[in-house]
Amino acid sequence: MTDQSHQCVIIGIAGASASGKSLIASTLYRELREQVGDEHIGVIPEDSYYKDQSHLSMEERVKTNYDHPNAMDHSLLFQHLQALKRGSAIELPVYSYVEHTRMQETVRVEPKKVIILEGILLLTDARLREEMNFSIFVDTPLDICLMRRIKRDVNERGRSMDSVMAQYQKTVRPMFLQFIEPSKQYADIIVPRGGKNRIAIDILKAKISQFFE
């Protein structure tokens, strides 16, 4: 864990796929932004750092285990976090869930006082944990996560229900048990019931607000 005197404060939010991480991150961002302004807080999704697969065929891309740490370019994410802490802007990769690879364009992200980082595998990497000022694990039952994942992937990512279920059984659940669940031990705060836990969100807001004082 890093010293809180750093210019850029990194807050990590991890948990299972469809556990409510993104909802918590977006709620914190939206409500804190109203207090401090866009220039002081930002969100970076770990999904942006899925490795480039443009050299692979679509058939090969869909076979990738996206719930394994090896699917992530954590080295690039680590470098970007260090750059933000030095006060340098980064070029955030853009990942397409439809094409299963990075796009050519990037999004410029300027340094902020607080960066909220959210993703399933954040706490599995010791380098990333060291860059976080504190970390959160969203602890939601897997059956609820599965229902949310089916709804999200079918409606928002152009997936079929059969493909979502097959991926869940083959990689999502096994990788959660092997990598994500054990990483909960590294979290400073564990949030049950996902993004609808208003009390937890208010506590997190109060904690994060201290960094703006």
UniProtKB/Swiss-Prot annotation:
The answer to whether UniProt assigns keyword Repressor to this entry is no
Q: Which family does it belong to?
A: Belongs to the uridine kinase family.
Record's protein name: Uridine kinase
This protein's gene is called: udk
Write out the annotated subcellular location: Cytoplasm
User: Could you tell me which species this protein originates from?
Assistant: Salmonella typhimurium (strain LT2 / SGSC1412 / ATCC 700720)
Entry keyword annotation includes Ubl conjugation: no
The record's Gene Ontology cellular component field reads: cytoplasm
Binding-site residues for ATP, renumbered to this chain: G15, A16, S17, A18, S19, G20, K21, S22
The protein's matches in Gene3D superfamilies, at most eight in alphabetical order, are given as:
P-loop containing nucleotide triphosphate hydrolases
Q: What is its main location?
A: cytoplasm
Identify the domain of life: Bacteria
Annotated GO biological process: CTP salvage; UMP salvage
